[in-house]
Amino acid sequence: YKDQGLEILAFPCNQFG
């Protein structure tokens, strides 16, 4: 999900946020 930046999926450490 790092490519999509989905913080709502419990992935706040993605590229977008």
UniProtKB/Swiss-Prot annotation:
Induction: By water stress. GO terms for molecular function: glutathione peroxidase activity. It is an enzyme of class 1 (oxidoreductase). Disulfide bonds: none annotated. One of its GO terms (biological process) is response to oxidative stress. It comes from the Eukaryota. It catalyses: 2 glutathione + H2O2 = glutathione disulfide + 2 H2O. Transmembrane segments: none annotated. Keywords: Oxidoreductase, Peroxidase, Stress response. InterPro entries: Glutathione_peroxidase (IPR000889), GPX_CS (IPR029760). Its EC number is 1.11.1.9. On the 2D-gel the determined pI of this protein is: 5.6 to 6.7, its MW is: 20 to 23 kDa. Belongs to the glutathione peroxidase family. This is Glutathione peroxidase homolog. It comes from Pinus pinaster.
